[in-house]
Amino acid sequence: MDIGLREWLIVIGLIVIAGILFDGWRRMRGGKGKLKFKLDRSFANLPDDDGDSAELLGPARVVEHREPSFDEQDLPSVSARETKERKGGKRQEEPRQGDLDLDEGLALEADPSDAAEPVEPRKGKSKGRKEKEREKAPAVAAEPAPVDEVLIINVIARDESGFKGPALLQNILESGLRFGDMDIFHRHESMAGNGEILFSMANAVKPGTFDLDDIDNFSTRAVSFFLGLPGPRHPKQAFDVMVAAARKLAHELNGELKDEQRSVLTAQTIEHYRQRIIDHERRSLMQKR
C-alpha cells in the first residue's frame, strides 16, 4: 500500500500532538509532586523534640522567641524548647512559694480540693448577708407612712368611646409615668422610672387597674391622678408635675379636668390644692417640734 505525503503529514501531526499532550500531562504531575514536596519540607523544618500535638503551636513559639530581643546576651542560643522548659520551671515553682494563691488557675491545678474550700465560706457569707438584707427590707416596706390627705385630679373623656388604650399609653409614657405596683402607673423622680414615687395614675373605672397585655383593646371613660400626703420629699413640685401631666392628657386626648368632687378643675381649685400642701407641711413641722 502506497502512503502519500498527505498520509505521512497526518501521522506525523498525530504523533506531535500526542507528544505535546504527554509532555503537558507529565509536567502537571511533576508540578503536583513538587508542591507536595514543598509542603512536606515546611513541616519538616519544625523541631523534632516531641511528636505531640503541642508542636502545632509554632506561631506562639515564634512570638516568644522574638520577645527577648531586648536582651543583650545569648539571643541566637534561645530556642523554642528552652523557652518551653523555662516556662515549665516557673509553673512548678509558683505553687511552692506559699499560700499566696495569686493565680487561681495554678491553685486549681495544684490541688482542686484546697482551692474549692476557701470559695465556699465566701459564698456562705454573701448569702448570709443577702438574707439579712432581705429580712430588713420587708420590715421597712411593711411599715409605710400613713397617708393623711390625697390630692386627686380626674380626667374624663368627652367622647363616649373613652380614652383608647394605645393613645392613652403613649400619652402617659411621654409624661414619664411607668407601669408598676398595683397594676397602675407611677411617676418617679426620674423619667426612666427611678427614684421615689411623686404621684400615680389609676383607672377611674372599676377595677381601677390597667391590663398591658390587652392594651390594644382597652378603653376607659376616665383616669385619676393622685398624690398622697405625706408622700414625696418635695410635694409642691410633685403636684406641679402631676397637674402638667393631667393637662397634657386632657388637651391631647380630648378630656376634661375635674377635681376630687368631679367638679370642673379651675385655677382656684389648683391654688386650693397647693394651699393644702402648705398647710400639711406646716402641721408636720409642728408635730416634729
Curated annotation (Swiss-Prot):
Positions of transmembrane segments: 2-22
Recorded superkingdom: Bacteria
Function description: Essential cell division protein that stabilizes the FtsZ protofilaments by cross-linking them and that serves as a cytoplasmic membrane anchor for the Z ring. Also required for the recruitment to the septal ring of downstream cell division proteins.
Gene name of the encoded protein: zipA
Xref: SMART domains: ZipA_C (SM00771)
Acidic residues composition bias: residue spans: 100-114
Gene3D superfamilies the UniProt entry points to: ZipA, C-terminal FtsZ-binding domain
Self-association and partners: Interacts with FtsZ via their C-terminal domains.
InterPro entries linked: Cell_div_ZipA, ZipA_FtsZ-bd_C, ZipA_FtsZ-bd_C_sf
Feature: compositional bias, Basic and acidic residues: 81-99
PANTHER family linked: CELL DIVISION PROTEIN ZIPA
Cytoplasmic side: 23-289
Name of the featured protein: Cell division protein ZipA
Ranges facing Periplasmic side: 1
Family named by the database record: Belongs to the ZipA family.
Keywords tagged on the record: Cell cycle, Cell division, Cell inner membrane, Cell membrane, Membrane, Transmembrane, Transmembrane helix
Main location, first listed in the record: membrane
Origin species: Pseudomonas aeruginosa (strain UCBPP-PA14)
GO cellular component, one term: plasma membrane
UniProt subcellular location: Cell inner membrane
Region (Disordered): 65-141
